[in-house]
């Protein structure tokens, strides 16, 4: 906490960006964006050129009768297990109104280190689903919304890959990761009834 560099500021709560009050101000809707290095903004030139930073600027352009406060709760290398700990041990104490989870890539990488057996995919993704079901249930109890999103990566969607992207796809065994990604995608439907929203981006 309380670290300041030319392109990065870490506030008193340990999040990237400006300070936030532990007690949420009146007429404020507080949103935590949670994920890994993509959310944190690795390589971004400033705090406001991260995903949460751009989102904050969009809301700042509109007068909707109350303040929307976007908090960058991204941590490089974070995956679902560490994100759950962050939510339970810190974020719940900061009066969230909404959690937006940008999820997937780091969990996929963790699985590659965990197992070389594709039969473990269902067990792995069931555990992932159960973690977020727990958080969504807490959201119901404590009156905050939870949005779970799956982040895209090379090979998902209908984009034609460049030679460089295709080479990277083969080098990193993305064909196996795509099987795992599809299993995550299928688990989203199991979260729909408990979470506020789920999306495969």
Residue map of PLM features:
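Membrane/wall-proximal cationic-aromatic binding patches
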Residues: 1-58, 62-63
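Asparagine-centered polar/low-complexity signal
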Residues: 9-11, 72, 106, 185
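Structured loop/turn residues at beta-strand edges in well-structured enzyme cores
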Residues: 27, 66, 94
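A mature extracytoplasmic/lumenal domain signature
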Residues: 33-35, 74, 150
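Alpha-helical cap/lid subdomain in secreted, periplasmic
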Residues: 53, 57-63, 81-201
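Generic structural signal for residues in well-ordered beta-strands
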Residues: 68-70, 198
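Short beta->alpha junction loops
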Residues: 72-79
């Amino acid at each position: 906490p309380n670290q300041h560099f030319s392109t990065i500021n870490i506030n008193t709560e340990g999040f990237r960006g400006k300070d936030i009050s532990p007690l949420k101000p009146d007429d404020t809707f507080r949103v935590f964006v949670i994920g890994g290095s993509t959310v944190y903004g690795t390589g971004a030139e400033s705090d406001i050129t991260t995903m949460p930073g751009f989102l904050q600027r969009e809301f700042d352009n509109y007068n909707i009768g109350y303040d929307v406060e976007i908090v960058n709760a991204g941590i490089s290398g974070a995956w679902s297990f560490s994100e759950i700990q962050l939510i339970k041990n810190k974020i719940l104490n900061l009066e969230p109104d909404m959690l937006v989870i940008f999820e997937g890539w780091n969990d996929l990488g963790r699985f590659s280190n965990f197992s070389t057996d594709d039969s473990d995919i269902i067990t792995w993704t069931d555990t992932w689903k159960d973690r977020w079901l727990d958080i969504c249930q807490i959201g119901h109890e404590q009156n905050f919304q939870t949005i779970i999103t799956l982040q895209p990566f090379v090979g998902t969607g209908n984009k034609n890959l460049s030679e460089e992207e295709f080479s990277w796809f083969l080098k990193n065994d993305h064909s196996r990761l795509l099987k795992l990604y599809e299993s995550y995608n299928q688990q989203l439907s199991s979260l729909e009834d408990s979470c506020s929203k789920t999306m495969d981006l």
